[in-house]
Amino acid sequence: MLTERQLLILQVIIDDFIRSGQPVGSRTLSKKHEIALSSATIRNEMADLEELGYIEKTHVSSGRVPSEKGYRYYVDHLLSPQRLTKDDIQKIKSIFAERIYELEKVVQKSAQILSDLTNYTSIALGPAVKENKLKRIQIIPLNQQTAVAIIVTDTGHVENHVITVPASVNPSDLEKMVNIFNERLIGVPLVDLKDKIYKKVADVLRKHIRNYDSMLQTIVETLDIPQEEKMFFAGKTNMLNQPEFNDIQKIRPLMKMIEQEKDFYRLLRKHNRKGIQVTIGRENQLSEMENCSLITATYSIGDEQLGTIAILGPTRMEYSRVITILNRVASDLSIALTKWYQNG
């Protein structure tokens, strides 16, 4: 159990190191107005904090820096929310300034604003398309042989495919087919569409449309939509601006991981609990991220959780500011999506 004095010194060390990036010594601490202690007393307390594993010595300075254990204690027990500036709030509101027709676009815009506000790398995981439900199908003829099939989901996800129209299918049959699809398939999850088409719609088409089968096969093929969530990055190279990553050899494995994306996809899939989650350094269980922290939050429509947004930065991250911003964006995103997609 840390004493009040040790808690104060630990907090000031971490706050100072986050601001400056420089190891903190007893002389620096003795000049802080909030610490009315002698250098000798501070040195003794710092020695105890080091022995307990909350701070550690660097090879290049007599000062101390926070350890992972120190950051974890700081995040869990010493952090206080930071007030957002008017400019911060205005930028967050700009995400929702326009009516949202495609959920993916607003998620992508959220990632960009998060990166702009924090100067770190932001990642957003969109909703899994397989969770989407069909809102409508349109087929727009381009000429006698080709048309564009448009599939729109309840979350605004849009898929466009150019298809070949069989010579045996005339425009009125095509229109009739689309009407039957929209009458019988609206609200069906995309993952179930093919099954429903063959079990419930094919018989109806057979009764009303001659030579329906070749066109049906063409439309069914357009429903092969990727099932995984889409992932959006913003500020991919922002980590290069952090002093701890001046050594390109140190940052190269992380940058490679960011470019390949699949490890981040798996990582974000794990972070699906409600509320803010902070994983620090080796807690991420990836060697490329042992000098990084990941802060995540989920967003939803009503009670239905849709995806995850995250900030990736150095362990020397501005936790208070980032958590406040991320919490606000996740909350505002959920409120806006619920209003637009659930309540119309």
Curated annotation (Swiss-Prot):
Gene3D superfamilies: 3.30.450.40, Heat-inducible transcription repressor hrca homolog, domain 3, Winged helix-like DNA-binding domain superfamily/Winged helix DNA-binding domain
Covalent S-S links between cysteines: none
Keyword Transcription: yes
InterPro entries assigned to the protein according to its UniProt record, in alphabetical order: GAF-like_dom_sf (IPR029016), HrcA (IPR002571), HrcA_C (IPR021153), WH-like_DNA-bd_sf (IPR036388), WH_DNA-bd_sf (IPR036390), WHTH_transcript_rep_HrcA_IDD (IPR023120)
Keyword entries, A-Z: Repressor, Stress response, Transcription, Transcription regulation
NCBIfam families: hrcA
Family assignment from sequence similarity: Belongs to the HrcA family.
Name of this protein: Heat-inducible transcription repressor HrcA
Source organism of this protein record: Geobacillus stearothermophilus
